[in-house]
C-alpha cells in the first residue's frame, strides 16, 4: 500500500477516527484551530512530502467554518509537497444550491464550492450520496460519489423485525432512490407520496400512491433537514393504516425545529449515518439510531490509493 496519510478537521473527528482504525493507520498530526480574531489556523506537524493524503471533513454546520478548514488544510498540505490530496467529504454542504430555479437571480453555490476546492489543489474528491449526482460535473477533478444504501439496507434486513415491509419515497424526486432500495430488499413493494398544493394559500395535500395498510413503511431519503415534511409524510401513512413507519437517510442535517418534529409519534424510528455528528438535543430523543459508514469509506480510500475500481464496490 502506498504511503497513506489521513488528516481531519473539526467537523467529523469521530468518523475520521473510525476510518483510520479500519485502515490500521493513525490520524495525521495537524493543528486545526482558531487565531484570537477567529481566523482559521492550520499547521501540519509531520512530513507529508510525496504522500498520498486524504483529508476527512464533512462540510456540515457550521458549514462555512468547516469548508474553510478543509480549504486551508488543502493549501497547507499542497505547500508541504504532498504527492496527492483527496478531499473526503462524507456530507457535501451547499449541494442543494445546484441550479437556478426559473432563472432566479441566485448563485449556483455548489459550483462555486467545486471551483474553490479545485483551485486550491485538490486532486480528487470522495463524497457520499450527493444531493444531486450532476454536481460531479461541476468539478475539474475526478469525483467518486459512493452510496450509503448498502449499509442502510443491511440494517433493514438484519436489525429490524419488519412485517410485510414497503419502501416509500417521500416525493416524486426520490423515486429512483426508493426503487433501488426496494430492489435490494428482495424487490419489495413501493409506494410514493405525491405532495400537491391545490391553489395558493391552501394547505399542501399528500396523496399516497400504493397500498400501505397494515404494513411497515420504510421512508427513504438522502438527507433529513428540519424533518417537517418527513413527519407529515409519516402522519399521512399512519392515517392510511400503516402499522409502523421507519425513516432511513444517509445525512442527518437536523436543522431548525428538527428535534421537535422528530419527536412526533408518527415516526417509530429514524436511522441515519455518521456523515454528520448528532447534536445533544437530537441524541436526547432516543429515537435516532446511527450507523457508521467508516467501513465503506475506508474501503473506498484503500481502493483510490491502490488505483482500484470504486464502482466494483456496488456491483
Swiss-Prot record:
Transmembrane segments: none annotated. It catalyses: D-ribose 5-phosphate + ATP = 5-phospho-alpha-D-ribose 1-diphosphate + AMP + H(+). GO terms for molecular function: ATP binding; kinase activity; magnesium ion binding; ribose phosphate diphosphokinase activity. Pathway: Metabolic intermediate biosynthesis; 5-phospho-alpha-D-ribose 1-diphosphate biosynthesis; 5-phospho-alpha-D-ribose 1-diphosphate from D-ribose 5-phosphate (route I): step 1/1. ATP binds at residues 37-39, 96-97. Binds 2 Mg(2+) ions per subunit. It is found in: Cytoplasm. Gene3D superfamilies: 3.40.50.2020. Mg(2+) 2 binds at residue 171. One of its GO terms (biological process) is ribonucleoside monophosphate biosynthetic process. The active site is at 195. It comes from the Bacteria. One of its GO terms (cellular component) is ribose phosphate diphosphokinase complex. Homohexamer. This is Ribose-phosphate pyrophosphokinase. The lineage of its organism: Bacteria, Pseudomonadati, Pseudomonadota, Gammaproteobacteria, Pasteurellales. The gene is prs.
Amino acid at each position: 500500500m502506498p504511503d497513506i496519510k489521513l488528516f481531519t478537521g473539526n467537523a467529523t473527528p469521530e468518523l475520521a477516527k473510525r476510518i483510520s482504525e479500519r485502515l490500521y493507520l493513525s490520524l495525521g498530526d495537524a493543528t486545526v484551530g482558531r487565531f484570537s480574531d477567529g481566523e482559521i489556523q492550520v499547521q501540519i506537524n509531520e512530513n507529508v512530502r510525496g504522500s498520498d493524503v486524504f483529508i476527512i471533513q464533512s462540510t456540515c454546520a457550521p458549514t462555512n467554518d468547516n469548508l474553510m478548514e478543509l480549504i486551508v488544510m488543502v493549501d497547507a498540505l499542497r505547500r508541504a509537497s504532498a504527492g496527492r490530496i483527496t478531499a473526503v467529504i462524507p456530507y457535501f454542504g451547499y449541494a442543494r444550491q445546484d441550479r437556478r430555479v426559473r432563472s432566479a437571480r441566485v448563485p449556483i453555490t455548489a459550483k462555486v464550492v467545486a471551483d474553490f476546492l479545485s483551485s486550491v489543489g485538490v486532486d480528487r474528491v470522495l463524497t457520499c450520496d450527493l444531493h444531486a449526482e450532476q454536481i460531479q460535473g461541476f468539478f475539474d477533478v475526478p469525483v467518486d460519489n459512493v452510496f450509503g444504501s448498502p449499509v442502510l439496507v443491511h440494517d433493514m434486513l438484519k436489525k429490524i423485525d419488519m412485517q410485510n415491509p414497503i419502501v416509500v419515497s417521500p416525493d416524486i424526486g426520490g423515486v429512483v432512490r426508493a426503487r433501488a432500495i426496494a430492489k435490494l430488499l428482495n424487490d419489495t413493494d413501493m409506494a410514493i407520496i405525491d405532495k400537491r398544493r391545490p391553489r395558493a394559500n391552501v394547505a399542501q395535500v399528500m396523496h399516497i400512491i400504493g397500498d400501505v395498510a397494515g404494513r411497515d413503511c420504510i421512508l427513504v431519503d438522502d438527507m433529513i433537514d428540519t424533518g417537517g415534511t418527513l413527519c407529515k409524510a409519516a402522519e399521512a401513512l399512519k392515517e392510511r393504516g400503516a402499522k409502523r413507519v421507519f425513516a432511513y437517510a444517509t445525512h442527518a442535517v437536523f436543522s431548525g425545529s428538527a428535534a421537535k418534529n422528530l419527536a412526533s409519534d408518527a415516526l417509530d424510528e429514524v436511522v441515519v449515518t455518521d456523515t454528520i455528528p448528532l447534536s445533544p438535543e437530537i441524541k436526547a430523543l432516543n429515537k435516532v439510531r446511527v450507523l457508521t459508514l467508516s467501513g465503506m469509506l475506508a474501503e473506498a480510500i484503500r481502493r483510490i490509493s491502490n488505483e482500484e475500481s470504486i464502482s466494483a464496490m456496488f456491483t
